[in-house]
Amino acid sequence: MKPPRPVRTCSKVLVLLSLLAIHQTTTAEKNGIDIYSLTVDSRVSSRFAHTVVTSRVVNRANTVQEATFQMELPKKAFITNFSMIIDGMTYPGIIKEKAEAQAQYSAAVAKGKSAGLVKATGRNMEQFQVSVSVAPNAKITFELVYEELLKRRLGVYELLLKVRPQQLVKHLQMDIHIFEPQGISFLETESTFMTNQLVDALTTWQNKTKAHIRFKPTLSQQQKSPEQQETVLDGNLIIRYDVDRAISGGSIQIENGYFVHYFAPEGLTTMPKNVVFVIDKSGSMSGRKIQQTREALIKILDDLSPRDQFNLIVFSTEATQWRPSLVPASAENVNKARSFAAGIQALGGTNINDAMLMAVQLLDSSNQEERLPEGSVSLIILLTDGDPTVGETNPRSIQNNVREAVSGRYSLFCLGFGFDVSYAFLEKLALDNGGLARRIHEDSDSALQLQDFYQEVANPLLTAVTFEYPSNAVEEVTQNNFRLLFKGSEMVVAGKLQDRGPDVLTATVSGKLPTQNITFQTESSVAEQEAEFQSPKYIFHNFMERLWAYLTIQQLLEQTVSASDADQQALRNQALNLSLAYSFVTPLTSMVVTKPDDQEQSQVAEKPMEGESRNRNVHSGSTFFKYYLQGAKIPKPEASFSPRRGWNRQAGAAGSRMNFRPGVLSSRQLGLPGPPDVPDHAAYHPFRRLAILPASAPPATSNPDPAVSRVMNMKIEETTMTTQTPAPIQAPSAILPLPGQSVERLCVDPRHRQGPVNLLSDPEQGVEVTGQYEREKAGFSWIEVTFKNPLVWVHASPEHVVVTRNRRSSAYKWKETLFSVMPGLKMTMDKTGLLLLSDPDKVTIGLLFWDGRGEGLRLLLRDTDRFSSHVGGTLGQFYQEVLWGSPAASDDGRRTLRVQGNDHSATRERRLDYQEGPPGVEISCWSVEL
C-alpha cells in the first residue's frame, strides 16, 4: 500500500473487488471504510455472460478517507459500464476513442499520477481500479458491468470468480444464472476457500435448461473463528458446465433480429496427425524451463495416437532433427523419442528462422514422397522463450519467410514461455499460418500448461469448415470459414437477420473428413426462438445483438494482427465504430471516469494488450518481490536441509531464504559425510537434539583443529542420544478401518512391493487406486486414483495434486483449500493438506502428503462398508473375507490374518493416525507389512 501523499489529510484504504469485492487493507474498524454490501449478478445466456458487480461502502471515520475500488475481470471480457453514486449524484464512465482520451491520460502522467485504471494481473485476469474521496459518514455505490463470451475448451465452459473481501461484509451475495436452450449436460462448482462452515452458503439448483448458483454467507460463516473478526474468504469460485449436443449441424438461436450458430458435433472420428515439435533449447531455457519442457514433451509423446506421425526439431544456435523424416508413432519410436527428449540440454543462441524452415521442409519432403496419410492434418508446434538472436533476427523477415514456406498447407501453433518472450511476434507468426499463440506462464505447473495446450489440438475432427446461410435471410455475418475443428472446442458464427427474411433460418455446414467430404443441415424457427428467449425472467434480454458485436470486434482485432498494412486501418476503424456504438472498452477505446468537481479528473481505463505484458511490471505469483521493492530488508542467502532432497539453497524473488531448526544439526549439515551405512535421507533427523557436553569431560589425547573437535564431539553425542532414545512413532502408509469394526484399524506398509502396485480396485464402485512405495522413505512416492463415473484421474505426488477430467489437468498445491463438486464426486482439501475424495454412494479415499518422519504420501479409507464383494488389490483384499488366527499363548499382541488363502502377520503397535491431518494422534492398531 502506498503511503498517504503529504499534501492530503485523508488516509487511504483499498477496496479490491475480484468479481466479488476485495478489500486489500485491514478491517473497517481500523480504517473507517466499511463495505456493508457486496453483490455480483452474473447472467449467462447461451454462453454470453453479463456480469454486474455492485459495492456499497460507508466512511465511518471522522475524517475524509480515500477509497479505491479495485476488481479483476477476465482478459477476454469487455467493460461496458462503470458508475459511482455519491450523495445521490451518479458519475458515469464515458467511453471514448483512445486518441480522444489521450490528453487526459497524458496530463495525469505528467503530474506523476497513475492514470491507467486497467492492468494485467496473473494469467487470465485484468485489474480495474478507480479512487474517490469519501466524506465522513458518506456512502458511495460503485457499479461495474462487463461482458464476455464463454469459450469452450476441452469440452467445458468456465466462469471464474475471485472471492477475497478481506473484511467481514454484512450483506454479501453472489448469483450466477445460466440459461442454455440446448440443455445443460453437466454442471460443477469448485472453490479454493470453502470451509465446513461455508458449505451451506453455496447452493446449486438445476433443471434441463437452467441453473442457479448462489453464494450467500452470513457474518458468522465468513469469520475465521468466533474470536477473530477476519474473513476466511480468500480464493476462487469456478463454475464449469457443458451442453447437450449430437451429430448435427449445431444449434441456431435467435433473439431480437440477431442469431448465433454454435457448432461442435459429437461422434466424429479423430483425424490422423503429422506433428513436428520445434523445441527451443537455447541458454535462456536452462534450469526449470528446460526441465519442465522435457517433462511435458515426454508425456505429450505418450499421448500420440498410433495413427500419427511425428518428429522432433531442437534448436539453439543451430537446428537439429531427431530423425531424417517423419516416423510413425509406434511404441518403439515413442520410447526412443522419450529418451531423446529426456536428454535435451539448454545452451547457445536462438535461431528460430532456421528451425521453422526445417520443420516446413520436413513436411514438404514427406508430402512429396507421398508419406503423409490421406486426410491427415499437419501441425507444427513451436515452443520458445525468447527473441531470435542467431541467423535471421528480424521478426518481420522471419514471419514472411515462414508464411511463404507454409503457403497455407500446414497449421502453426506458437507457445511463448514466460513474460520475456515477444508475444506479438509469435502471435502474428501463428495467425499468419492458420494457428494460434499461447503464453506458457513460468510457474510450478508449466509442464501441465504445455500438456493441456497439446490436448486442445491433439484431436482434429474436421478441416475446411464453412457455414452458409440464405442470402435473403442474413446479413453482417461474422467469420464463417475455419481451417480446423478440434475435439472439445466449438465454432461460433453470429449475424443479423434480414428485416423481412423467411420464417425459418436454414444453415449448411460443410467440412472434410479423412476420406470424404461431409455436409450438415440444420434449421431454426425464428418465431419459436424469439419466444424462447423472451420467457426466462431472470436472463437478461437483447443479449444476442451484443454477442454479435462482441464476437465481431474480437475477430476484427485478431485479423489486424496478420493483415497487411493497407488493410489494418480499415479493420481498426470497423472495430472502433462497433466498440463506441456498443460501449465496449477495447484496445481501441478508453473509459474516462468522471468524479465530483472538487476531485481530480485524471483517471482513464484502457484495455491492456497481451503483447504488452513484457513491458509491464506484473508478478503473478506471491507478493514477495513487491514487498522488497517497497524497501524492506532483504534477507541474506541461507540454506535449508530436506530429508528428501538434502541441502538446498532456495532462491527467493529478491534474494534467498534459509530455514534453520534451532538446536538441530547433523554431521552432514556441518559439511561432513554421514556414515556409509546411513542413507542420505537419514542424515538429518527432526527428533535429534545436541546435548551440551559436561565440563568434566576427559581431555582429548591429541590437539585437533577446534572446529573438527566440536564436530566430533557433536557427532559422538548425537549417536549416543540416538541409541538411548526410543524410535519415534511413525505414520503408516495406509490406514484401513476393519470390516464390521468401529474402532479397530489396520496400519499397512507394503514394504516388500516393488514398482507400481494395484492398491485397490472395485469395478462396481468404479474406482481404482495405484501407487509406488519407496521403502527407504517408508511412504508412497505417488498415488493415482481413477474414477469411472465421472471419468476423473487424481494423481498425487509430494509436489502437488493433479486432477484430470475431459483431458484437462489442474494442479493444486498441498495445504491449499479446495472444494470441488461434480456429479458423482466431491473433492475437498483443507489447510492441513488432507485431500478427501467422496460421494454419498462411494468409499471415501483420503490422500495426504506427510512431511514428518518417513516423508511421503499416505492413504486412508472411510465408509468402507460401501465396497462391493468384487473389491480387490493389495489393500482391497482386506475387505474380502478375513480370518483371524488365535493370539499366541505368550503374546496377545500378535495375530495371523488369512486373506484369500495367504497368511499375514499382524502386530499390535502404537502408530500415528493422520486421518484428521497433521500432526497426527497416537493410536493402537494392527500393523501389517506386505
From Swiss-Prot:
GO terms for biological process: acute-phase response; hyaluronan metabolic process; response to cytokine. Residues 595-618 are annotated as: Disordered. Keywords: Acute phase, Disulfide bond, Glycoprotein, Protease inhibitor, Secreted, Serine protease inhibitor, Signal. It comes from the Eukaryota. Gene3D superfamilies: von Willebrand factor, type A domain. SMART domains: VIT, VWA. Residues 658-688 are annotated as: Proline-rich (PRR) potential bioactive peptide. Disulfide bonds join 747-925. Liver specific. It is found in: Secreted. InterPro entries: ITI_HC_C, ITIH, VIT, VWF_A, vWFA_dom_sf. SUPFAM superfamilies: vWA-like. The record marks 688-689 as: Cleavage. Residues 29-148 form the VIT domain. Belongs to the ITIH family. Type II acute-phase protein (APP) involved in inflammatory responses to trauma. May also play a role in liver development or regeneration. Interacts (via C-terminus) with DNAJC1 (via SANT 2 domain); this interaction protects ITIH4 against cleavage by kallikrein in vitro. This is Inter-alpha-trypsin inhibitor heavy chain H4. It comes from Homo sapiens.
